[in-house]
């Protein structure tokens, strides 16, 4: 009987963490249209993670690279030489990191 009482808090903890987790798109590489052509999956966030996507463009707006993931995320835009790297974050709804281009 004592074992069952100990398992109850563990089970409730696992249930709560799965309810609080957010599902996001995960893609190693997508093209300029948002089509994932390498590593298309769904990920589930861990504590402190949200949905994220990164887009790399040239200064004149030409698409170079993009990916999607579950990650600890800070929205930033950084210029690196002739490239602009934009990191985007969201947590409002599941799969909020869908890319529309």
Curated annotation (Swiss-Prot):
It is found in: Secreted. It comes from the Eukaryota. The keyword Hydrolase does not apply. One of its GO terms (cellular component) is extracellular region. Residues 1-21 form the signal peptide. GO terms for molecular function: complement binding. InterPro entries: LY6_UPA_recep-like (IPR016054). Residues 22-99 form the UPAR/Ly6 domain. This is Urinary protein 3. It comes from Rattus norvegicus (Rat).
């Amino acid at each position: 009987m004592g074992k069952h009482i100990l398992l109850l808090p563990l089970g409730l903890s696992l249930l709560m963490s799965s309810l609080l987790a957010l599902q996001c798109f995960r893609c190693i590489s997508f093209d300029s249209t948002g089509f994932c052509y390498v590593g298309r999956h769904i990920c589930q966030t861990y504590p402190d993670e949200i949905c994220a996507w990164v887009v790399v463009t040239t200064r004149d707006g030409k698409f170079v690279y993009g990916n999607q993931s579950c990650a600890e995320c800070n929205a930033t835009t950084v210029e690196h030489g002739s490239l602009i790297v934009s990191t985007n974050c969201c947590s409002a709804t599941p799969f909020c990191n869908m890319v529309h281009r």
